[in-house]
């Protein structure tokens, strides 16, 4: 089948014909052998062909013998020259029997052709025998055109041309024989030839001239000059028996680097000057990248110009670049023995993006000589490979002049000649910092703790403000093993130590001038057993028991008072300080970490410490007030690896910032609910400090909804709201007030489960925070659009104020992440709420859901629903989906007039794209333009079918666009209102 298919393919090139014998070219007698030697036999004659050239012919016409006689004519021996099949083209004329006057019944109008193979010219007049065997019959030839002889006229007729195929041949040569058995004919010429495939170049592959040995013959090709094979086996093509190449796809050769295909893929041409080709392939030559050149033809790479370089990791097609210039505007901030350097990026980055910085330090003596700084100095995050334009340097000695050289580097800096340019800065430390703390004493030790004390050093610039204790286990190496403790007294208790372990301790003091240097390391050791401290522990147990009894009594009294207040139908309020809290009915009570004398104790109590070696940070996914938010992996021994979210505390933090950062972990660690973000643990014993929580794949709810606008059903949205309400019910039962409930603080996992997050961070935003969501109010930052009016005015945060915020979250969810109150200013929002205006229902919002929102926005906080009631109401809606099909009307009751956000008049938009962006459908701007909807006149006629054709497949998006078009039509009617102004101006 494959061979038959190859024979059916069209040919790639014309076949060549190689002549073995052509009587037209013979000028002497042919002297072919005839048999028998009798009268009436074949006769050799001379004649003229159609072109009046002299040719040798044979004629026969024996009509005398009735019954016919076989007349044989045999050519000379013809070498086949490797041909397997030979073609014979015979030119002859044949007399019509009826036109012959003496024609007998044995007159024929045909003759027969035979051939005989032999290894040499061995035939004689009698051998081989003149019969069909040993001769091999080729064909009996009949004339298509007969010559007629009319009385008194010359014979007329056409020349017959017949081509026969001989073979297959296997011996060195052959004879061709003609047998006449009663015909009157003339053999005008004989052309013996064979066919072969001519040489061929296709797809950069050369195939030689080939004589076919079989029906089809595979021929191996070779790549043309400057081409290389790219496939194994080498490319091949089939030569057919008729001398034609079978057409098939030829692949396997491509031009070498520095060469491109040309002349219809027949040659590989060298790339010209100024161009190059870096790899093997069919691509064209490319112009040299920036700052490079090629002076020679056939270049696989362009060389960099003087002063420009290409890094080893850069591809050959990348431009050549230079090292960056020096950083600019280096400034320093000195705080005692700690220095922070900051600088601006260099003017010239060298054309690269892998910019890093390196800082070198030299200590200059009064005599003028400068030496490298000592090993006691530390750089944070390091002296080299800095990606941010700052570095913190610790361990500076007082009254010393330092020279810091800041250099910018990139991927080609190591290839450049000479050192990189740098920007120097000289810093002289103050001599006023406290001296090193020495004479550390162990006043008491136990198997897990050490109590140390030391003499108060003399501070030249005033009193010592506090101390920093640095300690680590002897033999432990690396920054993760070092711990720090701050104390305001000249004593410290080191807790959580290993039994019978040796520790190295250093202390430094801080005055108004900053920190002094650390003193010499002091060796201390914990006890092996507890025999020496049992008395202290016994006293501690007794004291704890007494305190516990007192606390139980106080809690019981508070619970009774709270139950009485609840029986009067009034909600218990929470003060601004979380330390005042209630006991829930059989529920664990939230404890404010700031009620602890040492907030770090709250972290140890409620958050699990995780070894930093179990944590792997994979990528940064966001940034917060205190540092970066990353995605990573947690692999604790004996547990399955899990994906976690990691909040990190940025460098240069104060102790207050560290305490407030970790307070969120102290809060989160007290909660355990499927709709509350789960705390995995904290990393506090290494830098950076981390908080690890479960990873929520879909991120914040507001951005997730905006990204999937119109893609969720009402039931799905109500299910999300039910999960949020369930989490808030749990927090309310634990007597915790969130204060910052908003869709941005709700996280969504891959199963669309919503979980409440962000416990505490928003309460610590500083006054100079740039986040526009939070506005200053009575000394703190408040998210105005989500906060109840009593909380804005009097900072009275309660579970009822969280209910108000929950109503705003409901509106955000049903509007797919729309910003509450749109572009109204915060002051306009406050004024509108004071005048009892409320948000209108989002598009297609069920009436029951908007009514629940209005209930949450009651001015009287005691009239707002509690979270158990909210959960119950949402459960009823989910069980009765028909209630969600009643869509809210865009007007409110008498007690709750609704804010009106009318769409501006379409004439206010400069283009269709601007209109699409205004209705949050800007993603379809290019699709509208490509489909011809470029004017409002055309857009006003758009239909749902048009939207599908454009590519708007989401039903929610179709509704929004068609509703806006309908509004546009109403605006175009005569007398229609203009409808200008923002939402804050139209109530």
From Swiss-Prot:
UniProt keyword list: Angiogenesis, ATP-binding, Cell membrane, Developmental protein, Disulfide bond, Glycoprotein, Kinase, Membrane, Nucleotide-binding, Phosphoprotein, Receptor, Repeat, Signal, Transferase, Transmembrane, Transmembrane helix, Tyrosine-protein kinase
Chain intervals for the UniProt region annotation (Disordered): 965-987
Limits of the Eph LBD domain: 17-202
Residue window of motif PDZ-binding: 985-987
Free-text tissue specificity from the UniProt record: Expressed in various organ systems, including lung, liver, kidney, intestine, muscle and heart. Expressed in myogenic progenitor cells.
Location in the cell: Cell membrane
The reaction(s) this protein catalyses: L-tyrosyl-[protein] + ATP = O-phospho-L-tyrosyl-[protein] + ADP + H(+)
GO biological process entries: angiogenesis; cell adhesion; cell migration involved in sprouting angiogenesis; ephrin receptor signaling pathway; heart morphogenesis; positive regulation of aorta morphogenesis; positive regulation of T cell costimulation; protein autophosphorylation
Signal peptide per UniProt: 1-15
Domain of life of the native organism: Eukaryota
TM segment ranges: 540-560
Domain SAM: 907-971
KO phenotype (gene knockout): Embryo display cardiovascular defects and lethality with very high penetrance. Growth retardation is observed at 9.5 dpc with arrested heart development and lack of blood flow. By 10.5 dpc degeneration and necrosis are apparent throughout the embryo. Conditional lymphovenous valves knockouts show a complete loss of lymphatic valves.
Glycosylated residues, chain numbering: 203, 335, 426
Physiological role: Receptor tyrosine kinase which binds promiscuously transmembrane ephrin-B family ligands residing on adjacent cells, leading to contact-dependent bidirectional signaling into neighboring cells. The signaling pathway downstream of the receptor is referred to as forward signaling while the signaling pathway downstream of the ephrin ligand is referred to as reverse signaling.
Family: Belongs to the protein kinase superfamily. Tyr protein kinase family. Ephrin receptor subfamily.
Description of how the protein assembles with itself and partners: Heterotetramer upon binding of the ligand. The heterotetramer is composed of an ephrin dimer and a receptor dimer. Oligomerization is probably required to induce biological responses. Interacts with RASA1; the interaction depends on EPHB4 tyrosine-phosphorylation.
PANTHER family noted in UniProt: EPH RECEPTOR A5 (PTHR46877), RECEPTOR PROTEIN-TYROSINE KINASE (PTHR46877:SF19)
Name of the protein this chain belongs to: Ephrin type-B receptor 4
């Amino acid at each position: 089948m494959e061979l038959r298919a190859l024979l059916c393919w069209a040919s790639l090139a014309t076949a060549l014909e190689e002549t073995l014998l052509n009587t037209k070219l013979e000028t002497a007698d042919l002297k072919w052998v005839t048999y028998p030697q009798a009268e009436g036999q074949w006769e050799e004659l001379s004649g003229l062909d159609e072109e009046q050239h002299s040719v040798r012919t044979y004629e026969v016409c024996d009509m005398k013998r009735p019954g016919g006689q076989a007349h044989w004519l045999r050519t000379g021996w013809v070498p086949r020259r490797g041909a397997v099949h030979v073609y014979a083209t015979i030119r002859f004329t044949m007399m019509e029997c009826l036109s012959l006057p003496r024609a007998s019944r044995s007159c024929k109008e045909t003759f027969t052709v035979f051939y005989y193979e032999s290894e040499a010219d061995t035939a004689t007049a009698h051998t081989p025998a003149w019969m069909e065997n040993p001769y091999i019959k080729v064909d009996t030839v009949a004339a298509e055109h007969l010559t007629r002889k009319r009385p008194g006229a010359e014979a007329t007729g056409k020349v017959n041309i017949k081509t026969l195929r001989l073979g297959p041949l296997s011996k060195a040569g052959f004879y061709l024989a003609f047998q006449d058995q009663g015909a009157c004919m003339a053999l005008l010429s004989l052309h013996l030839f064979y066919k072969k495939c001519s040489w061929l170049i296709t797809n950069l592959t050369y195939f030689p001239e080939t004589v076919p040995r079989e029906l089809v013959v595979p021929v191996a090709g070779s790549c043309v000059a400057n081409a290389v094979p790219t496939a194994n086996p080498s490319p091949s093509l089939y030569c057919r028996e008729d001398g034609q190449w079978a057409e098939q796809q030829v692949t396997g050769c491509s031009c070498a680097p520095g060469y491109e295909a040309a002349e219809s893929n027949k040659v590989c041409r060298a790339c010209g000057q100024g161009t190059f080709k870096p790899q093997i392939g069919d691509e064209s030559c490319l112009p040299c990248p920036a700052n490079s050149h090629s002076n020679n033809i056939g270049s696989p790479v362009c060389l960099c110009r003087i002063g420009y370089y290409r890094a080893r990791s850069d591809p050959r097609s990348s431009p050549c670049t230079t090292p960056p210039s020096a950083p600019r505007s280096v400034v320093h901030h000195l705080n005692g023995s700690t220095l922070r350097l900051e600088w601006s990026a260099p003017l010239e980055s060298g054309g690269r993006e892998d910019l890093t910085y390196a800082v070198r330090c030299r200590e200059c003596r009064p005599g003028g000589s400068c030496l490298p700084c000592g090993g006691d100095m530390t750089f944070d995050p390091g002296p080299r490979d800095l990606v941010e334009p700052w570095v913190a340097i610790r361990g500076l000695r007082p009254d010393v002049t330092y020279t810091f050289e800041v250099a910018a580097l990139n991927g080609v800096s190591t290839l450049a000649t000479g050192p990189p340019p740098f920007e120097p800065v000289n810093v002289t430390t103050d001599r006023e910092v406290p001296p090193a703390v020495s004479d550390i004493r162990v006043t008491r030790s136990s198997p897990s703790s050490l109590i140390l004390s030391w003499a108060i050093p003399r501070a030249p610039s005033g009193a010592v403000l506090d101390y920093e204790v640095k300690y680590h286990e002897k033999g432990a190496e690396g920054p993760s093993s070092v711990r720090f403790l701050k104390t305001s007294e000249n004593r410290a208790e080191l807790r959580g130590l290993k039994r019978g372990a040796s520790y190295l301790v250093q202390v430094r003091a801080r005055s108004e001038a900053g920190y002094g240097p650390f003193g010499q390391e002091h060796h201390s050791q914990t006890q092996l057993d507890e025999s020496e401290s049992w008395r202290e522990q016994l006293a501690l147990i007794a004291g704890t028991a007494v305190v516990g009894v007192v606390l139980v009594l106080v809690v019981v009294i508070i619970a009774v008072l709270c139950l009485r207040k609840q029986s009067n139908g009034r909600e218990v309020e929470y003060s601004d300080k979380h330390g005042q809290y209630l006991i829930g009915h059989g529920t664990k009570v939230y404890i404010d970490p700031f009620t602890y004398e040492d907030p770090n104790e709250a972290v140890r109590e409620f958050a699990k410490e995780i070894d930093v070696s179990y944590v792997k940070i994979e990528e940064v996914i966001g940034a917060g007030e205190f540092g970066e938010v990353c995605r990573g992996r947690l692999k604790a021994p004996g547990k399955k690896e899990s994906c976690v979210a990691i909040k990190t505390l940025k460098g240069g933090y104060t102790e207050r910032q560290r305490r407030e950062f970790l307070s969120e972990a102290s809060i989160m660690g007290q909660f355990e609910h499927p709709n509350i973000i789960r705390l995995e643990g904290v990393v506090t014993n290494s830098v950076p400090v981390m908080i690890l929580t479960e990873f929520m794949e879909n991120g914040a709810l507001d951005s997730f909804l905006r990204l999937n606008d119109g893609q969720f059903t009402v039931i799905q949205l109500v299910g999300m709201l039910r999960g949020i309400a369930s989490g808030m019910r749990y927090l309310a039962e634990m007597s915790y007030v969130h204060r910052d409930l908003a869709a941005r603080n709700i996280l969504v996992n891959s199963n669309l489960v919503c979980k409440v997050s962000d416990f505490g961070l928003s309460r610590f935003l500083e006054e100079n925070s740039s986040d526009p969501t939070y506005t200053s109010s009575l000394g703190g930052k408040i998210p105005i659009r989500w906060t109840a009016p009593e909380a804005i005015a009097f900072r009275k945060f309660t579970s009822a104020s969280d209910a108000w915020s929950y109503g705003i979250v409901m509106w955000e969810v049903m509007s797919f992440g729309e910003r509450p109150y749109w572009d109204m200013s915060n002051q306009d929002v406050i004024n509108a709420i004071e005048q009892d205006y409320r948000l209108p229902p989002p598009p297609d919002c069920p009436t029951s859901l908007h009514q629940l929102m209005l209930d949450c926005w009651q001015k009287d906080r005691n009239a707002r629903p509690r979270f158990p009631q909210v959960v119950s109401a949402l459960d009823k809606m989910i069980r009765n989906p028909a209630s969600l099909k009643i869509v809210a009307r865009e007007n409110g009751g008498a007690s709750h007039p609704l804010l009106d956000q009318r769409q501006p008049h379409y004439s206010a938009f400069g283009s269709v794209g601007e209109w699409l962006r205004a209705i949050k459908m800007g993603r379809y701007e290019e699709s509208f333009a490509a489909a011809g909807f470029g004017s409002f006149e055309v857009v006003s006629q758009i239909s749902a079918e048009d939207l599908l054709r454009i590519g708007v497949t989401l039903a929610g998006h179709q509704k929004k666009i068609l509703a806006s078009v309908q509004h546009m039509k109403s605006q175009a009617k005569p007398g229609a209102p203009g409808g200008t102004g923002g939402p804050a101006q139209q109530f």
